[in-house]
């Protein structure tokens, strides 16, 4: 993905659906762009690890004083030399150190790519949760407006009754307080909706976040999916495809390659050189044409890479422990998410089966009774409170159910 394309501001649709949000996030989410840059950095490290050291070319020139170069044929007072040195490239290839460095770097690239996939998994869950929160906040705003409208109608009815002398001012005051409190709830719900939309826009990579869109309301109240597969099947899927676990395995491979490289570093690097020099060319020249070959080998007399080897061995142990920790964490995540899905499914089913309908029916009946004078204002307010509480609880149960579904997807490695 070209950087300019990735940085382009994605226009949010007027009604933001889940698929659209995930697509926009994958194209330009801030954290995903950072993860892409980390992969590119690892690829750069791999290119550097495979680099072959450049040979070194040297040359020098000088002049001898107090020497008569004309006294003999071929003599010269000018000295010059040229040399070529291999700082260890040939030795690097023959000893296999370059190949081992490449193994380490390639494993690091694989780990970076898998870490990017894991970032996509975790961040996709954040996007889904943010959209669920936005849908819940919109539904709560609709509920708050419904309550405000109902309480305002009750206030207006009581206003007419008091003018007719049918009720006292105290009862009207109660109705007015209920209406004002309901309007307070509307204002708070509107603020929550706006804040939630701004957070969604930020997560999706908007450079100038705005709240001029609506979250798809069907994200909450829609048919529930079929029962999840058995727990053992979900656990196997998580262990096979979770990118954080695969990335940890790649890091373990990188650590093992690093240990092999540390051990191979005990083989001394050999530097080769060749030099040609002359100061004159005759038999009496100060320095007749001379070719010199050299070799330089460090003698590992006092230090044989013990520190690097010990560090590499410790890193292998740490990476293996990390793999085991992530395996256990993956199984915990799967079991917790599956339990949450099942529990919230039962709550939603119970709400849909009877509880929600009975709370609404009770509110409607008491409303009719109050309008006919057969119920008190306190009974009406209590019925409205129970209905609002039940409806709000139902919306929260729906939110928690779908969040648990998305968490289960993330737990098994789906993004």
Where are these regions (language model features)?
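Short, charged, amphipathic alpha-helical segments
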Residues: 106, 169-178, 377-385
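Amphipathic alpha-helical coiled-coil scaffold segments and their short linker/junction regions
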Residues: 19-28, 82, 91, 167, ...
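Periplasmic alpha-helical coiled-coil/stalk elements that build and connect Gram-negative outer-membrane
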Residues: 16, 116-237, 340, 344, ...
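Small/polar, glycine/serine/threonine/aspartate-rich low-complexity segments that form flexible
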Residues: 12, 58-101, 217-228, 260, ...
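Cleaved targeting-peptide boundary
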Residues: 10-19
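A glycine-/polar-enriched beta->alpha junction
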Residues: 23-33, 40-55, 68, 83-104, ...
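Amphipathic alpha-helical coiled-coil segments
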Residues: 34-49, 119, 123-145, 153-156, ...
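Sec-dependent N-terminal signal peptides
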Residues: 2-10
């Amino acid at each position: 993905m070209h950087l300019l394309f990735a940085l382009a501001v994605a226009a949010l649709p007027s009604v933001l659906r889940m698929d659209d949000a995930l697509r926009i996030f994958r194209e330009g989410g801030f954290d995903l762009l950072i993860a892409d840059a980390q992969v590119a950095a690892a690829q750069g490290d791999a290119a550097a690890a495979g680099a072959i050291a450049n040979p070194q070319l040297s040359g020098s020139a000088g002049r001898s004083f107090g020497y008569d170069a004309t006294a003999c044929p071929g003599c010269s007072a000018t000295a010059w030399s040229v040399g070529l040195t291999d700082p260890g490239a040939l030795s690097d290839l023959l000893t296999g150190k370059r190949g081992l460095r490449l193994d380490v770097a390639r494993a690091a690239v694989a780990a970076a790519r898998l870490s990017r996939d894991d970032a996509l998994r975790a961040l996709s869950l954040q996007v889904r949760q943010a959209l669920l929160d936005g849908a819940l906040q919109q539904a709560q705003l609709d509920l708050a407006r419904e309550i405000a409208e109902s309480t305002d109608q009750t206030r207006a009815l009581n206003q007419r009754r008091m003018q007719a002398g049918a009720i006292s001012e105290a009862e009207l005051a109660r109705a007015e307080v209920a209406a004002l409190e309901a309007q307070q709830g509307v204002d708070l719900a509107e603020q929550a909706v706006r804040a939630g939309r701004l957070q969604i826009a930020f997560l999706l990579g908007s450079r100038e976040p705005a709240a001029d869109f609506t979250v798809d309301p069907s994200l909450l109240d829609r048919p529930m999916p079929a029962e999840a597969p058995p727990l053992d099947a979900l656990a196997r899927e998580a262990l096979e495809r979770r990118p954080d676990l695969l990335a940890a395995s790649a890091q373990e491979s990188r650590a093992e390659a690093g240990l092999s490289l540390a051990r191979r570093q005990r083989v001394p690097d050999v530097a080769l050189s060749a030099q040609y020099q002359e100061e004159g060319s005759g038999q009496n020249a100060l320095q007749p044409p001379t070719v010199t070959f050299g070799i330089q080998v460090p003698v590992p007399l006092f230090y044989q890479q013990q520190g690097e080897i010990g560090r590499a061995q410790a890193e292998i142990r740490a990476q293996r422990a990390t793999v085991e920790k992530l395996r256990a964490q993956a199984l915990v995540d799967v079991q917790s998410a599956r339990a949450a899905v099942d529990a919230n499914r039962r709550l939603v089913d119970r709400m849909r089966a009877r509880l929600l309908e009975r709370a609404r029916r009770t509110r409607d009946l008491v409303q009719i009774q109050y309008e006919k004078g057969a119920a008190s204002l306190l009974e009406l307010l209590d019925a409205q409170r129970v209905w609002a509480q039940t409806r709000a609880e139902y919306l929260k149960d729906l939110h928690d159910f779908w969040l648990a579904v998305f968490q289960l997807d993330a737990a098994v490695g789906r993004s």
